[in-house]
């Protein structure tokens, strides 16, 4: 059995000069990079591609190259749906994990812009702990 996905067109019928926005959620950890496009409310997913879907080796999932390839796939799918502009929400692991995004974050954003998508707002949505669980490491911290 083959599943056939129907393509909904969200672009305007008036012309190509109007901007039709979507939201791209880029989650860049040090193990993988997710590029996920939704509508403005965040309810409907148009496309979701990870770095692991683009490369074979586990060590390359979070690489800038894998993030760039994932972003190019996302742009192709967005253009099918009629989306020509994106608001960007970038996220690192956060919480008790690291608050700096992984190596694929910058590469994914650059690939989106170079592929012809208009970039609206860029926002950092990394979760910040407000008195959370105990962090990894001893009482004296991680000793190098």
Swiss-Prot record:
Pfam families reported for this sequence: Ribosomal_S11 (PF00411)
SUPFAM superfamilies recorded: Translational machinery components
Biased segments, Basic residues type: 135-144
One Gene Ontology MF term: structural constituent of ribosome
Name recorded for this polypeptide: Small ribosomal subunit protein uS11
Cross-referenced InterPro entries: Ribosomal_uS11, Ribosomal_uS11_CS, Ribosomal_uS11_sf
GO cellular component: ribonucleoprotein complex; ribosome
Keyword Ribonucleoprotein assigned: yes
Region (Disordered): 123-144
Residues passing through the membrane, by range: none
Protein family: Belongs to the universal ribosomal protein uS11 family.
Taxon lineage: Eukaryota, Discoba, Euglenozoa, Kinetoplastea, Metakinetoplastina
GO biological process: translation
Keywords: Ribonucleoprotein, Ribosomal protein
Source taxon at top rank: Eukaryota
